[in-house]
Amino acid sequence: MFPRCLRPTVLVRAIKLLVLVSSGIMFIKLVVLEKCTSSLGSLYYYDQNYTYRGSAVGTTETGPKSPEKVRVLVWIMTGPKNLQSKASVVRETWGRRANQLLFFSSVTNETFPTIGLNTTEGRQHLTAKTVQAFRYIYHHHLDDAEWFMKADDDTYVIMENLRHFLSQKNTSEPVYFGYRFKPFVKQGYNSGGAGYVLSREALRRFGKQGTDPKLCEQDGGDEDVHFGQCMQNLGVRITNSTDSDGHTLFHPFHPETHFFGTYPRRINFYAFRKARKGFEGISKHAISFHYVSPTLMRLLELYLYHIRPYAN
């Protein structure tokens, strides 16, 4: 979570969206799809040294696992005013590729549906939403997935790339992944907007001790900072969330902000690794982006899942 001085302006985002519409196919092909092509039916991951096919045999949860066998529960932080304008688009696009998709709001909506939490809307209550949502998931869904991701209703996630990343991780270890910021918490904390992922062991520790206000703030302040402090207090480690070339996988800003390097002025005060731009900054196996409008979500679906170049 950034203070207001670090949040992109509406004007900048609008300009960048126009750039994306005019050059999006080329951008997405180069940044995300180069050597990493997927379809809704059969997943393929390409690397210079090997080819992975979706029919590979998986192993135990404590070792490498076939990506399509990795179970990920995703929960979306939303609100009553955003259900039709934002949350519904998440559900129609990338959210349907999660193994389980839950929406949490301050109000229960049985039609959408959303799970109502004991809190009110507003930025000052995002911490309460987060801790209550994870507590609900601990009590009702701990055994339904190996990994548990929190995202916003303006986050876009490429689930195939997330599963591929997690397939080499151990969900029995107390870890959580995301875009790492460095101030305020000794080990740093992961950006809420970029989305962060807890292992089952991390969720288990939170479920058993997360109600203790001495360990975990229950409301107020910046949600991702407070939750990062909570994770540290529970012995949950932040570990590397970049690819083998050091390029970022989780992204707390709009795609063009990362690609063109138009970051907020104080980004390197916050970023654990120096923020870079272009192909040196964004992994070709990128997992998430933030500040993604409903229109852009649908465009990303088009570019990623429906347009294919002819093979040579």
Regions found by a protein language model. Give the residues of each.
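Secretory-pathway lumenal glyco-enzymes, predominantly type II signal-anchor Golgi glycosyltransferases
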Residues: 2-312
